[in-house]
């Protein structure tokens, strides 16, 4: 099933958490905390055509009590507001890698900082 987030939102599939501790104790599913990281599966048109700070395939970190959970085709996802994303894990867009090679400083400001005005 296709899902297109609206506004400044992204669709995220949580990353699986480890099933056992470092000492080998198996953690039952009902005792595990849900991971606070996931893979972006879809971005809204407002983000893909505007900010472009987050794109499909990025691994992101987000706040513990943020977003809305939905189930699509038996898979659990989160719908998150752009402002609820804490950061991109690993390499991301120019604004999250420190590579600010925009030809114009205004382009960088528009790309990465407009969503922080809220």
Swiss-Prot record:
Q: Does the keyword Chaperone apply?
A: yes
Record keywords: Chaperone, Cytoplasm, Stress response
Cellular component (GO) terms are: cytoplasm
UniProt keyword Cytoplasm, yes or no: yes
Q: What SUPFAM superfamilies does UniProt report for this protein, alphabetically?
A: GroES-like (SSF50129)
Q: Where can this protein be found?
A: Cytoplasm
InterPro entries per record? Chaperonin_GroES (IPR020818), Chaperonin_GroES_sf (IPR037124), Chaprnonin_Cpn10_CS (IPR018369), GroES-like_sf (IPR011032)
Q: Which GO terms describe its molecular function?
A: ATP binding; identical protein binding; metal ion binding; protein folding chaperone; protein-folding chaperone binding; unfolded protein binding
Single Gene Ontology BP annotation: chaperone cofactor-dependent protein refolding
This protein's major location comes to: cytoplasm
Task: Please report a single Pfam family linked to this protein.
Answer: Cpn10
Q: What's this protein's function?
A: Together with the chaperonin GroEL, plays an essential role in assisting protein folding. The GroEL-GroES system forms a nano-cage that allows encapsulation of the non-native substrate proteins and provides a physical environment optimized to promote and accelerate protein folding. GroES binds to the apical surface of the GroEL ring, thereby capping the opening of the GroEL channel.
Quaternary structure annotation from Swiss-Prot or TrEMBL: Heptamer of 7 subunits arranged in a ring. Interacts with the chaperonin GroEL.
Q: Which family does it belong to?
A: Belongs to the GroES chaperonin family.
Official protein name in the record: Co-chaperonin GroES
Q: Which organism is it from?
A: Helicobacter pylori (strain ATCC 700392 / 26695) (Campylobacter pylori)
Question: What lineage is on file?
Answer: Bacteria, Pseudomonadati, Campylobacterota, Epsilonproteobacteria, Campylobacterales
